[in-house]
Design a protein with these regions (language model features):
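Structural signal for beta-propeller blades
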Residues: 82-85, 135-137, 190-192, 244-246, ...
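Residue-level detector of Asp-centered blade-edge/turn motifs that repeat once per structural unit
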Residues: 68-71, 121-124, 176-179, 230-233, ...
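Bacterial Sec-dependent N-terminal signal peptides
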Residues: 1-40
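Blade-level signature of beta-propeller repeat domains, shared across WD40, Kelch, NHL, RCC1
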Residues: 329-357
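Conserved beta-propeller blade signature
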Residues: 73-75, 126-128, 181-183, 235-237, ...
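Gly/Pro-rich loop segments of beta-rich domains
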Residues: 34-64, 91-117, 145-172, 200-224, ...
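Short loop/turn segments that connect beta-strands within beta-propeller blades
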Residues: 87-91, 140-145, 195-200, 249-254, ...
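Short loop/turn segments immediately following the C-termini of beta-strands
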Residues: 79, 132-133, 187-188, 241-242, ...
């Protein structure tokens, strides 16, 4: 990793930790009656290194994001390892990346990444990777062939064909739309970008000026959007981290504040009370709730915008019941068909599993 990227990541983590300490604290709310939240370690022995093998003896080098395919295979963006790891059949292996710094396309074990920061599994079997410091979106087929899907490696802003489109360094979330289009949080450009199945990049929401403005997608403003997802009705939810809230974009193209007070903190409660400080990722459960990683906590947001903390409290490492469990920069999330939640616990170099019983 380039030294400037190391400094950037360190500064980011410091800022997150500081924000957490400064924000007002809300007590953890208990899980719903009849539901117990259990946190366990699913993969990784906690060593900051690279080693394939059985789940609990495998090693990761800052696992930053996680995705699950339609056939139940887990994929992990091993950020500082510059690899995409695969978890299947109780074993951890490499899908793509040779561990060296670069942007080379090709077969899995010869391809290279700069900073594989975000990962998303598409229904047809492709894996999309946000190579953030390289300003590219990469695609990996099920057989492990890596190609550049959009972006040139030059940081900037430009819509158009995927071969000439430009993104800024530090891209955030990625989501797959119902028509197969790819949506990207172009965080430092303050925009949500759309990559159509036909290979055209356009601006879906946001503009050059950054701030907080609701309204049509063409006039709306965001400040460091970092995670996106769609619900079953086609609404997009955006973690607008610079504004410390979650925004909602309807299929009609209207942007509004969904929940959060725009004040940094960890308070639980309704849309006008709840606080956030840094949402890394969001997933949707079968009941339509948003599950999100926010600081050292895993939180739930109901369809009405009510926020509660279901696991985690202070920084550390501990399995157990939700409120007693500890994480160290829980980042990417993925949910399986049984409702189990998988967490890329980045600074603990582990993949954690949250079961609801």
């Amino acid at each position: 990793m380039k030294w400037e990227n190391i400094i950037l990541c360190t500064a980011l983590l410091t800022a997150i930790t500081t924000a957490c300490k400064k924000g007002s604290s809300g007590g953890n709310q208990p899980p719903p009656v009849g539901k117990k939240v259990i946190v366990t370690t699913f993969a990784g022995d906690g060593t900051d290194a690279y080693l394939d093998g059985p789940l609990l003896s495998a090693q990761f080098h800052t696992p930053i994001d996680i995705a699950i395919s339609s056939d139940g295979i887990l994929y992990v963006a091993d950020y500082n390892g510059r690899r995409i790891r695969k978890i299947s059949g109780g074993q951890v292996s490499v899908l793509a990346g040779d561990g060296n710094f670069g942007s080379r396309d090709g077969a899995g074990d010869t391809a290279q990444f700069v900073d594989p920061y975000r990962i998303e599994a598409a229904p047809e079997g492709n894996i999309f990777v946000m190579d953030q410091a390289d300003s590219r979106v990469r695609r990996i087929t099920a057989s492990g062939i890596v190609s550049t899907y959009a972006g040139t490696g030059v940081a900037g802003f430009k819509d158009g064909d995927v071969s000439v489109a430009l993104f800024r360094e530090g891209m955030g979330g990625i989501a797959v739309g119902s028509q197969g289009d790819i949506y990207v949080d172009d965080t430092n450009n303050g925009r949500i970008r759309k990559i159509s199945a036909a290979g055209q990049v356009s601006t879906f929401a946001g503009k050059a000026s950054k701030g907080f403005v609701d309204g049509d997608t063409s006039v709306a403003e965001f400040l460091n959007p970092n995670a996106i997802l769609f619900d079953k009705q086609g609404n997009m939810y955006v973690a607008d981290n610079g504004n410390y809230c979650i925004r909602k974009i309807t299929p009609a193209g209207k942007v509004s504040r969904f929940t959060g007070t725009a004040t940094v903190g960890t308070a639980d409660g309704g849309p006008g009370i709840a606080q956030f400080h840094y949402i890394y990722d969001m997933v949707l459960d079968k009941d339509g709730n948003l599950l999100l990683s926010d600081g050292d906590r895993i939180r739930k947001v109901t369809p009405s915008g009510e926020v509660s903390t279901i696991a985690g409290s202070t920084t550390g490492y501990a399995d157990g019941d939700g409120p007693e469990a500890k994480f160290n920069y829980p980042a990417g999330l993925a949910i399986d068909t049984d409702g189990n939640l998988y967490v890329a616990d980045a600074m603990n170099n582990r993949v954690r599993k949250i079961s609801f019983k």
